[in-house]
Amino acid sequence: MTLKSQDYAALAEDAYEDRAGGRRDPSQEPAIDIGGHMYKVLEHVNDRRTGYQGTVYLREDTNEVIVAHRGTEQILHDALIADAGMVVARTNTQAPEAIALTRRAVEWAEQKSELTGKHMEVSVTGHSLGGALAQVTAHHFDLKGETFNAYGAASLGYRIPEGGNAMVNHVMAADPVSAASGHYGQVRIYANPNEISNLHSSGFRNGAVAQFLVPDSALLAAGRSLQSHKMENFLAEKSVLDKPETQALAKENSGMISEYRDKLEFLRGGVTTITRGGMGNAADIIDRIRGPLDAGEPARKVTEEEQRRSSSLRMDDAQHPGYMMFLGAQRGVQEQDARVGRSPDIGSTQLAGSLAAEMKAAGGERIDSVLMNK
């Protein structure tokens, strides 16, 4: 991947832009400047029912495909339904749409790679809720990417492991959202003086003895640190990404930062346990016993299930992936029956099915006509 962290940040921010939904033909789509690089939008989804919004970009100079999932913007759909659902139910109502959009991006890149003979990289990004969706989809399809102040996906009910190097998750030290849950991938922490001051005034100290002697309040600190969650911390002249001193400050104050973030995650875990109830907690215990899934395994399982389902269907079943090809073969066989004065029967249907199966096995996409050998 040639994209830098600042490039991902620009795309995560651009995902908040309102666009007409649907797929685009890149040959007909104008290029747009995002963070100093030219991109074309391949697809945009904006579902007002669930609040999900995502955009697929094609970077012109490198032919890389990036899926950017939009973060928390609408209070009702995002904060109350999607964000709260991650805490209470360990699920995300927007995840199925995010996975579907990412799947289309991966399939598009694979098709283009076959045509050109050059591999096209696909990666993901997002801020806040969008960062959680980026982690979910990265694990689902075994992709790389970067997030910004994401709600960590490791606590969700998708059997996603915590840690690893598949993702880079950039977080502000006092951001309460990214502190509430473990992350898929590595975490890079940045701090500014105002955050350290807020943590200090909320009772947090560096060093075990100081932490023991001075009472602290994670919720008070979180309430004072809402500015830390904003995407602007990673953009333009305010960006902490290219300021080594922000990571150095975080390292110098790692004691109080870790204490604060650990307490917020503990509090979130308590809320999850209480609201999940007996059945929910039992399911969570089973998931912990089963352990996390390998990266890419969810997508492989879906593919295997689709193949199993399609192999059990007859070619003349409308759900079969070769059904349209069967209809073309059937139409051609019936035309030949009519030419010789024969009424179509079960044999005609079987012949059409055989022709369609052979054409599909040979890599064909459709049957336009059927001709008899002389």
Please describe what each predicted stretch is.
Residues 67, 127, 145:
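Divalent metal-coordination and catalytic microenvironments
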Residues 20-122, 140-141, 151, 155, ...:
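A conserved cap/lid and substrate-binding interface adjacent to the catalytic center
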